[in-house]
């Protein structure tokens, strides 16, 4: 078994995928080359990887409403980091602050070595962003969309054309390069949106509900691509409503009511859930626990603690 992988019990979804899906070809993006400071350290030793995102005591208020409260964490080079939580938990607000789309009410965020308070433009040049509602120009062709985003990141001439051609090939869009983005299927729009987000070989990729509306085959293909990007040194921050997809993250954070309830690897989060269940007289076995089981246990324990008088 490759290093960094944690075994888990197969699910019905796994069986369905094995029985019905053909083996996928390579999905690595040729534009995603490892940064020069990436070492050969295995996924078992992430502390040796440099920190690319640092959130230190960040919070966000809207009037008197606290959307995110005193949140701190780090994301390292080549790490897949997930943000999970129920609706209204604060994960989208946290995500938007990391992207520079929202300013924290307090605290500090560093992205790719840049303080977002003072050097937002420098950070944005090093990140890619794929929105849930694809940020494409429907009346422009596939190639024109790629050209627009490539130019916005400072690429021109043959260097830009090489990146466009590589993106078209990597995402299987070569035959549709002259097709307008608005006429593409949902899956092709998602692929084009990903290609636009990666056209400049970003150090960090932000994915907002990227598998929302996708079928199982498309979701599996998406995660194969994300794993290939991470292996090449790209850090990935993802929000998702599919709890089972947290298994594909190196680490993830669970929020509710703006507060961090758990942070760690899938196994560490399950262990946290098992401890919380034991305290309340329930029993969950880590090796038989799904991410959904852990998520429900942690969120329910967090809500009980808020209801208990201090």
Residue ranges and their predicted role:
Residues 205-209:
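Catalytic Walker B motif of ABC-type/P-loop ATPase nucleotide-binding domains
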Residues 263-264:
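ABC ATPase "signature
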